[in-house]
Amino acid sequence: MSKNILLAVDAAPRDPTRHVVAAAAMARDLSRDTGDHVIVLHVHEFAVGRFGRLQVDCGDGEGEGVVETIVSDLRAAGVSAEGEIRETHVGHVATAILSEAEEHDARIVVLGSSSRTDLPRLLLGSVASRLLHMAARPVLIVPRSDAPARAAQPLAATTAAGER
């Protein structure tokens, strides 16, 4: 069995910390329980248009900064961790995350949900929703750290081959 946890993080300008912090804490706790290595992954989206390549997600190294901070915090907590940055075309973030999970033979993919709404699809967000439906390995979706107490448990999880 794999000894890796893939922690997928974003750096969305709207509020990059609450859901990322909650997911990182969950990955830290899982790693402490299992001794697994944590791979912190950020995927940049880009589009190619008439005038060349255009970055569509956060710029100015925000993604790299978030990854570096989380890796540093995990290591300070005694967890083995490394960071990775990948790029993909717009709309293919879930596929890129699953590709990295496959490459690293991750035991589980962990990510946070950034939405505040109660509508299930919007609650999870499009990337989280796609991961849950496409994954052939366990996926754990963690609510925002400021979510109501009723949502203190993971929002959704799969076991294997997309089972919930």
Model-predicted segments: where are they?
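Short, flexible loop segments at boundaries between secondary-structure elements
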Residues: 134-150
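Structural beta-alpha unit
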Residues: 1, 75-109, 149-151, 155-164
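Short secondary-structure boundary segments
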Residues: 9, 42, 108, 112-114, ...
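General small-molecule cofactor/ligand-binding pocket signal
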Residues: 39-41, 82-86, 140
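A short acidic, glycine-rich active-site loop
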Residues: 56-65
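Charged helix-capping and loop-helix junction motifs
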Residues: 21-23, 98-99, 123-128
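Glycine-rich, Arg-bearing micro-motifs that act as flexible, cationic patches
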Residues: 15, 108-130, 148-152
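Small/aliphatic-rich secondary-structure junction motif
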Residues: 2-57, 73, 77-79, 159, ...
